[in-house]
Amino acid sequence: QLALAALEVGEGALHRPDAPQRLALWREALREHLRRLFMDSPRLLGQGRTPCMPLLVACPGLQPELQYASLALQAWLEQHVLGMPMSPWLQGCQKNPGAWLLQWVHESPTVPAQLLLGAMPMGGALQCTWPVLELDDGGAVLKQLSVHMRADDAFTSRPHLGGRCLETGCWSRAGAVPVHDVWTRLAMRIAEVTFLAQDTQGKRLQAGAWSLGAGESIAWCETARGVLVHWLQVDGQGRIERYSVLAPTEWNFHPQGAVAQLVRALPELVAPHAV
């Protein structure tokens, strides 16, 4: 929708999502994080019998009419995720995220905190200082991607930028927060959920589209998994002629990317039977 709308505003113009689109993006990112925390994390971190589904089903964040800054959602997160009031938790995370997250998982009795505590030995040992996909305000990075997507249909299966494999995720929106290992990446899901719960206007996640001329446009949005890019080209009658999607997964699971490098490092960190 954003990419098509951008075609109507003229070449070189930036089109931003409207209020309903921003709300939909915010809801979906928040819910995706909650599902991953309470559905996937217990199984993947070796706690498959943890009774998480009843908690998730009762979460106000899954209600169809969820609105920004929901007090019910904030109270639920304080009880079942943070184990403490939200404001001091956020203050601690913003002041010294590394030290705060370590202190929090050792003190909080909540399921997410205890799962992270159990993942610390392995996750902390898996170091990853991979370059991240960063989008500039002028759209230069997106325009570079559009050149590749136009020239090569296979580009989206093995993307690169300037010959480099990049990664993207909620940790790549962390700004000055140092994210150098797998454990901190897992913990950033908690921080992201908390920041999203306090968002009052849907400004936490960025999205937009650029009109590139000649019936071509490129759109992006920040999702729970990272930056999602859509590129399209229409013919003279306005019908979609070519269309490509560049998902966060393609960056993160590139054969020479961050996950592949971490998997190669596993035999050095754990016994062969554990791998």
Task: Give, region by region, the residue ranges found by the protein language model.
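Active-site bordering "gate/hinge" segments
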Residues: 1-225, 251-275
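Short beta-strand elements
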Residues: 228-247
